[in-house]
């Protein structure tokens, strides 16, 4: 994929390896809004507007370096898709969501977002995140650990967190940005165990944090959609831990990429 970095934007040549709709609407990030001819996305106090232009796409931002990493532009997704296309079950999902890329989002933002995501839908998750931003800093950016920790359980209930309010309140007292960064050096099994030890984080949420925050490809988050997919392609099975392990064994280090193509396809059909 070819792209050019300028002072205030990235220009991406027309390609099958980048599509903002595929990327932003496949459940890996929630702080974005659809605008005319594109999307506005926020991450770690940075913002960008992605628009379609004659030659491809433009990412307009004051922090070009951040969004080059955020959209994982240096990774060869054509090569990843070629490897996954060896599996017949991946042909239609990759054709449908060919422009997906795995985002490199902020660790703390990812953790909080996916605690909020448990048994929730994307529109409601977005409303909660935007309400937290407004409450903590007037909507300027995703709240810092310090800003969120200053909120009471009642404050968290007030923005719509429901039963997740006391869970997030406790998690904020178990870990902060520095601790999450320290865990980068752990292998995926040890890191998952650390995450699951935190309040409000089960296996599926932990795997989402591993994939979208830590960039670990050797995980396969399993939710209702992926459970249905597994039963359709393989065998009736309700043990999501076993489903995840079977799919990681199958796809190896590309399991996380396979999950995103399959999730986007399954949810849309």
What annotation goes with each model-predicted range?
Residues 1-269:
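HhH-family (HhH-GPD) DNA N-glycosylase catalytic core used in base-excision repair
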């Amino acid at each position: 994929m070819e792209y050019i970095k300028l002072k205030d934007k990235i220009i991406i040549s027309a390609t099958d390896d980048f599509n903002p709709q595929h990327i932003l609407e496949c459940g890996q990030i929630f702080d974005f809004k659809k605008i005319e001819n594109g999307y506005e996305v926020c991450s770690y106090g940075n913002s960008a507007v992605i628009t379609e232009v004659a030659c491809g796409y433009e990412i307009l931002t004051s922090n070009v370096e951040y969004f080059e990493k955020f959209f994982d532009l240096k990774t060869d997704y054509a090569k990843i898709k070629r490897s996954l296309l060896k599996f017949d079950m991946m042909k239609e999902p990759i054709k449908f969501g060919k422009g997906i890329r795995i985002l490199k989002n902020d660790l703390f933002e990812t953790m909080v977002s996916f605690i909020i995501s448990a048994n929730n839908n994307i529109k409601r998750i977005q409303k909660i995140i935007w309400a937290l931003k407004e409450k903590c800093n007037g909507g300027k950016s995703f709240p810092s650990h310090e800003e969120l920790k200053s909120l009471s359980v009642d404050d968290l209930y007030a923005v719509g967190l429901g039963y997740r309010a006391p869970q997030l309140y406790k998690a904020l007292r178990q870990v902060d940005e520095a601790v999450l960064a320290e865990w980068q050096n752990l292998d995926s099994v040890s890191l998952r165990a650390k995450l699951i030890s935190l309040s409000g984080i089960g296996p599926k949420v932990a795997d989402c944090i591993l994939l979208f925050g830590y960039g670990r490809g050797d995980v396969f988050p399993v939710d209702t959609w992926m459970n249905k997919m597994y039963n359709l392609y393989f065998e009736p099975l309700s043990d999501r831990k076993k489903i995840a392990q079977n799919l990681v064994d199958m796809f190896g280090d590309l399991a996380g990429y396979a999950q995103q193509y399959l999730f986007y396809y399954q949810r849309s059909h």
